Design a protein with these regions (language model features):
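Metal-dependent polysaccharide deacetylase catalytic core of the NodB/CE4 family, i.e.
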Residues: 1-103
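C-terminal domain-boundary segment and adjacent tail
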Residues: 102-129
Length: 129
């Protein structure tokens, strides 16, 4: 945060919105926000019920993405992940990388390479208001 990054809510337990009752999902979001105090929200897996969206949009700015790097795939290498960034990034892209156990090894290589390439292409990084 001191370096200009923002923190957003992504639920406390990374639960899927269609697998849980709306009240359970909203409670899980609230649990996370009790700790991180964010005004941004991104739903795990990019899905949520209309009722959940309606409720959450009153308290949070909902942020989606347009490029998932697939860094979690066991079939992709770090180079493949960087190539996904190069192939699919466009002006205004919101790019998703993961820091999970499935992706962490690739993240250490792919993220710095992708950031370098993006800067070389003239892309700028901005936070949400």
């Amino acid at each position: 945060i001191a370096e200009g990054h923002q923190v957003g809510n992504h639920t406390f337990n990374h639960i899927g919105a269609f697998k849980h009752w709306a009240v359970t999902y909203i409670f899980n979001v609230t649990q996370a926000n009790d700790i991180i105090h964010a005004h941004l929200f991104r739903p795990p897996h990019g899905w949520m019920r209309h009722s959940v969206y309606w409720w959450l949009s009153k308290k949070y700015r909902i942020i989606m993405w347009d490029l998932v790097t697939r860094d979690y795939s066991k079939w992709l290498t770090a180079k493949d992940v960087v190539n996904n960034v190069k192939r699919y990034t466009r002006n205004g892209s919101i790019i998703t990388f993961h820091d999970s156990l499935k992706s962490i090894d690739k993240l250490h290589t792919a993220l710095p390479e992708a950031l370098t390439w993006l800067k070389e292409q003239g892309y700028e990084f901005k936070t949400f208001e």
